[in-house]
């Protein structure tokens, strides 16, 4: 990893500008952390899942700081807690995670680029067919998962494979020259499907499209810059609209049986609610923006807990992390009587002393692995488990990069698996470790097996090509 002089100068100039504009050192530290986290997680193989995931984590640690500094508008974390120490600890966790990933990536060399490896694993027609079929299969898998709790994690992980198929299709549409109209069509379909579910399922299609474009990104191409800008604006606008309509939409989703069973009815309702929101008073939009920042900036409840530990409640000496590790090494397939994980809302109630909605309301309030590490160990020992998790993520990335030989299969697996494993700062240790291990165990090995199967065909094709280029000499009788 090298730091170019122009990069350091640019970071210094941006930091100085931000400091004088906001008159605050915290945004400068935050931007420096973002730069280092992205720089440390670059894998130099044109797969940007890890850097983008760390950037999204950083957003959840610092969004409110910049929102307040730019607009002057406050959210509960600003006026209701001492948020600054928690932001610093959160940034430290992002950096510890990034350092762990970098250290482990450095210990295993990447595959030799001079060694030939197959590019495409599937034909375009098969890919389109798999994508269309995955749209219908996804709903069925999610519906049956609650009825089979023993296999629920396996089912939901296999359902995640649909995102890999989606990414493969988007990646194919980006190469050799991006087909913007088809990319927009596929992403538009996914956004509609995502916004008509109960949760905000429109984020991943936009992220996957951005990652597909980044693989072929050319800094000298204006269309590529325009695509990144459009994706950013669309993501922000969709987030704002969803935050403005989700309360009414979810109420109707749960109370009206016919509404929940009819996708066309949900599409029409989302359209009507979105139209009404966009025509609302500007002050209502600002309040919705405040709510969106509050939702994404996962600092408020951790900051309240930080004030109470260890003054009111003692450190737990590693109990939370130990329970999370125990949970992942006792899969429900082999331990069907394993109790459910406690809701994050229970931790918020206990450590932040705020009675938030919980499992009894079919919801969970995010608490996050960062504050759990602090409650367990305090500072600076809290950064050790984060660093250790980074080591595991880096080791897994390096392992699958050498094990999966088809470029297309590796890029799809790495993009989906490592994005979903790392991108959320608000996850608890149990959820983050469980998600990561499920993806590595239930999704990774099948991809490796598929890769080996397809390599047989690749080897046969190469042998056939060599035979055509260098035919065996004819045996001739000596004279």
Ranges and model annotations:
Residues 10-17, 55-67, 129-139, 188-197, ...:
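Aromatic-anchored segments of alpha-helical transmembrane domains
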Residues 8-16, 32-37, 163-169, 185-194, ...:
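Hydrophobic, membrane-inserted alpha-helices
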């Amino acid at each position: 990893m090298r730091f170019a002089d122009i990069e350091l100068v640019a970071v210094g100039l941006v930091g100085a500008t931000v400091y004088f504009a906001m008159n605050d050192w915290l945004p400068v530290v935050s931007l420096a952390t973002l730069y280092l986290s992205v720089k440390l997680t670059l894998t130099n193989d044109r797969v940007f899942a890890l850097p983008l995931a760390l950037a999204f984590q950083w957003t959840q640690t610092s969004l409110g700081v910049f929102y307040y500094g730019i607009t002057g508008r406050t959210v509960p974390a600003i006026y209701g807690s001492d948020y600054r120490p928690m932001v610093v600890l959160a940034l430290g966790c992002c950096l510890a995670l990034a350092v762990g990933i970098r250290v482990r990536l450095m210990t295993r060399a990447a595959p030799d680029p001079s060694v030939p490896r197959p590019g495409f694993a599937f034909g375009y027609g098969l890919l389109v067919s798999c994508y269309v079929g995955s749209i219908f299969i996804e709903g069925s898998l999610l519906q049956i998962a609650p009825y089979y709790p023993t296999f629920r994690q396996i089912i939901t992980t296999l359902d995640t494979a649909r995102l890999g198929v989606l990414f493969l299709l988007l990646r194919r549409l980006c190469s050799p020259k991006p087909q913007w109209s088809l990319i927009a069509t596929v992403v538009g379909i996914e956004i509609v499907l995502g916004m008509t579910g109960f949760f905000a399922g429109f984020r991943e299609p936009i992220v996957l499209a951005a990652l597909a474009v980044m693989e072929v990104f050319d800094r000298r191409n204006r269309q590529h810059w325009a695509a990144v800008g459009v994706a950013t604006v669309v993501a922000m606008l969709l987030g704002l609209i969803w935050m403005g309509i989700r309360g009414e939409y979810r109420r109707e989703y749960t109370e009206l049986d016919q509404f929940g069973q009819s996708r066309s009815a949900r599409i029409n309702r989302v359209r009507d609610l979105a139209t009404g929101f966009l025509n609302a008073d500007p002050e209502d939009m600002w309040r919705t923006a405040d709510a969106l920042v509050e939702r994404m900036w996962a600092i408020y409840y951790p900051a309240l807990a930080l004030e109470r530990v260890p003054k009111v409640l003692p450190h737990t000496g590693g109990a939370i992390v130990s329970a999370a590790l125990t949970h992942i090494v006792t899969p429900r397939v082999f331990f069907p009587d394993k109790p459910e994980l406690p809701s994050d809302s229970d931790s918020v109630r206990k450590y932040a002393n705020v009675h938030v909605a919980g499992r009894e309301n079919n919801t969970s309030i995010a608490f996050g692995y960062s504050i759990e590490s602090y409650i367990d160990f305090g500072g600076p020992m809290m950064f050790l488990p984060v660093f250790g998790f980074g080591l595991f993520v880096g080791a897994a990335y390096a392992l699958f990069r050498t094990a999966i030989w088809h470029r297309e299969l590796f890029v799809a697996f790495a993009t989906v698996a490592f994005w979903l494993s790392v991108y959320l700062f608000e996850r608890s240790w149990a959820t983050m470790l469980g998600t990561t291990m499920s993806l590595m165990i239930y999704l990774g090995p099948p991809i490796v097996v598929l890769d080996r199967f397809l390599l047989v065909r690749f080897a046969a094709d190469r042998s056939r090509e060599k035979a055509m280029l260098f035919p065996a000499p004819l045996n001739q009788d000596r004279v």
